[in-house]
Amino acid sequence: MNICIFGSGAIGSYIGALLMQSGINVSLICRGEHLNAIKNNGLLMQSAESGTEYFCKPLATDNPKDIEKQDFIIVTLKAHSAALTANMLSPLLKESTTVVSAVNGLPWWYFYKTSGKWKNYRVK
């Protein structure tokens, strides 16, 4: 099984490390300093509760074309970035790919200048 974490910041990297710990083949899409840190150092997951550590070195890239087609894609981006990256998923998709949204960071202005029921609604 191949799973891609699309948006591997803190939450995405944590999910990816947990999946790798379970023996699943995981690839991470991330960028900038976080990408460089993962490529150079891998991921170290530490549990404050149990005191255990888990180290892994997943395939990490900023280019979805570097990764084979996936069985699952977990999108762990901030809400304001999700729509902008939808087209970037296409190289990862096959007919049976499942895409799971784990989007976070819904800002108060999310509905600003939208139409319909939620037009200009302020998230509280």
Annotated model-derived regions:
Residues 1-47:
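NAD(P)+-binding Rossmann beta1-loop-alpha1 motif at the extreme N-terminus of oxidoreductases
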Residues 13-26, 51-54, 97-103, 107:
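Short, charge-rich amphipathic segments
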Residues 41-61:
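N-terminal short beta-loop-beta anion/metal-coordinating cradle
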Residues 55-56, 61-124:
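Rossmann-like NAD(P)(H) cofactor-binding subdomain of soluble oxidoreductases
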